[in-house]
């Protein structure tokens, strides 16, 4: 990816639902146009269709299940995510962990449907294992720093560098994102300087009084 990538996970925060989700999406669209950065969002599943059709930004599902069409009540069907207009999906977020077999099956299903894949990992070893599955992105997020307000870029830059090297050693075509506590342009710049193509983040944007201002700051040093 040539342009830096900022992916905002709205999770199930109240601040990321309904009209609030639209406010964040509109802010992402505005800042992306101004900066040239690619800013995507991962909204709740019920928001995938409106977000995908109303805004000129990439929209990702927060999860898919390793299933095919059939009797799977309550599961997230990859085909349904694609039909809703999503560009891609998160897989194996620390709040929705999967087995390695299911991660692989999800990546294969997404590839068949031309959905981009962002496989989340928690250290350099799991990053290397994920890279072997040939996703589009591996996103390294130390779970202890997620939502902590302490940036991985400052608290543990070594894990970013090790993960980038581990992924490149397995498959240099896989892009690397990092996340956990990302909250400023300085955090993003450090991550990019260490070899990532961008960041995955949530609360610093979703819970902000002014998401547009935060997004503008996040890309300000790129």
Swiss-Prot record:
Involved in the gluconeogenesis. Catalyzes stereospecifically the conversion of dihydroxyacetone phosphate (DHAP) to D-glyceraldehyde-3-phosphate (G3P). The keyword Ion transport does not apply. It is found in: Cytoplasm. The keyword Isomerase applies. The active site is at residues 93, 141. It catalyses: D-glyceraldehyde 3-phosphate = dihydroxyacetone phosphate. Pathway: Carbohydrate biosynthesis; gluconeogenesis; Carbohydrate degradation; glycolysis; D-glyceraldehyde 3-phosphate from glycerone phosphate: step 1/1. Its EC number is 5.3.1.1. Substrate binds at residues 9-11, 146, 181, 202-203. This is Triosephosphate isomerase. InterPro entries: Aldolase_TIM, TIM_sf, Triosephosphate_isomerase, Triosephosphate_isomerase_arc. GO terms for molecular function: triose-phosphate isomerase activity.
């Amino acid at each position: 990816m040539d342009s830096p990538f900022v992916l905002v996970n709205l999770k199930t925060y109240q601040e990321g639902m309904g009209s609030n989700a639209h406010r964040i999406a509109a802010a992402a669209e505005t800042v992306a146009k101004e900066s040239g950065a690619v800013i995507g969002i991962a909204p709740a599943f019920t928001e995938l269709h409106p977000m995908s059709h109303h805004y000129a930004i990439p929209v990702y599902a927060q999860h898919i299940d390793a299933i095919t069409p059939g009797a799977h009540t309550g599961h997230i069907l990859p085909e349904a995510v694609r039909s809703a207009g999503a560009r891609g999906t998160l897989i194996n977020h620390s709040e929705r962990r999967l087995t390695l077999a299911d991660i692989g099956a999800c990546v294969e299903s997404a590839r068949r449907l031309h959905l981009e894949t962002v496989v989340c990992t928690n250290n350099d070893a799991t990053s290397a294992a994920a890279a072997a599955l040939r996703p589009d992105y591996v996103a390294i997020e130390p779970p202890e720093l997620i939502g902590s307000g302490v940036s991985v870029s400052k608290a543990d830059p070594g894990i970013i560098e090790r993960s980038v090297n581990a992924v490149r050693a397995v498959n240099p075509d896989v892009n690397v994102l990092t996340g956990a506590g990302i909250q400023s342009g300085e955090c993003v710049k450090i991550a990019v300087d260490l070899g990532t193509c961008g960041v995955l983040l949530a609360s610093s944007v979703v819970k902000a009084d002014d998401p547009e201002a935060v997004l503008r700051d996040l890309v300000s040093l790129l």
